């Protein structure tokens, strides 16, 4: 081992960012109150930030329910805030992120995908374009690429081959980002879902043998 880097950023982060940018508009994201104030961004980020315990606790707190009811009353588009209230009452954050994940996977092969979301008595259909997904996941993607280049810099050598694993390694967008950062270095993949566990098991064997 000549170098290593790491950060808690992965597939969930891609799904969360895509859900935030592409799926929260029908729930009031980007709308205003009757007095012209923008709806608070955190009310649309916190319910889908499923890997952030603090954000989840804030959104699903009893105090926040009062804030959501107030925003619903003051909203120019109250029907959208009614859906956000349903996210609170029915704990829909995980299902929204799951819909984003399904769209992300579909957009690996197609230019557009439709996310179908059941909320209240409606079945919402939200179209997501591949270009919109690329823009939505730019922040976590950039973090991942920075980790790759940092590891190469610390190691002081260009790798002979890059091994990508984990579910997100299937994404052509991430693979293209790695190829751009390290051109002319071949990328290989193993078991997308088993390699991480196998690697951890082997390292545990080294540590606790």
Feature roles, as predicted:
Residues 4, 110, 118, 165-167, ...:
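Generic beta-strand/beta-sheet core signal
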Residues 20-29, 180, 184, 202, ...:
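Short, well-ordered loop/turn and helix-capping segments at boundaries between secondary-structure elements
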Residues 1-119:
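Phosphate-binding glycine-rich/basic clefts of nucleotide- and phosphate-handling proteins
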Residues 8-9, 175-202:
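Conserved phosphate-binding/catalytic loops in two-lobed NTP-binding clefts
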Residues 88, 92-93, 157-178:
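Glycine-rich phosphate-binding loops at beta-strand->alpha-helix junctions
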Residues 85-93, 121-152:
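Adenine-nucleotide phosphate-binding core of ATP-dependent small-molecule kinases
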Residues 99, 103-106, 135-162, 177, ...:
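Phosphate/ATP-binding catalytic cores across multiple sugar-kinase/actin-like superfamilies
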Residues 31-37, 47, 151, 155-167:
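Short glycine-rich phosphate-binding loop at a beta-alpha junction
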């Amino acid at each position: 081992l000549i170098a290593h880097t790491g950060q808690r950023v992965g597939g969930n982060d891609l799904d969360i960012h895509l859900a935030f940018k592409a799926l929260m508009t029908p729930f009031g994201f980007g709308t205003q109150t009757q007095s012209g104030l923008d709806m608070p961004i955190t009310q649309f980020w916190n319910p889908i930030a499923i890997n952030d315990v603090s954000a989840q606790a804030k959104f699903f707190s009893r105090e926040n329910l009062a804030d959501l009811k107030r925003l619903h009353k003051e909203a120019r588009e109250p029907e959208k805030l009614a859906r956000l209230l349903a996210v609170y009452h029915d704990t829909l954050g995980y299902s929204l992120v799951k819909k984003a994940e399904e769209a992300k996977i579909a957009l690996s092969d197609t230019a557009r995908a439709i996310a179908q979301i059941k909320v209240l008595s409606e079945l919402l259909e939200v179209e997501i374009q591949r270009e919109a997904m690329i823009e939505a996941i730019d922040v976590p993607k950039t973090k991942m690429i920075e980790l790759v280049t940092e590891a190469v810099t610390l190691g002081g050598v260009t790798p002979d081959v890059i091994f990508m694993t984990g579910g997100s390694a299937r994404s052509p967008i991430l693979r293209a980002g790695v190829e751009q950062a390290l051109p002319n270095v071949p990328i290989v993949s193993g078991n997308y879902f088993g390699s991480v566990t196998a690697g951890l098991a082997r390292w545990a064997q080294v540590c606790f043998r």
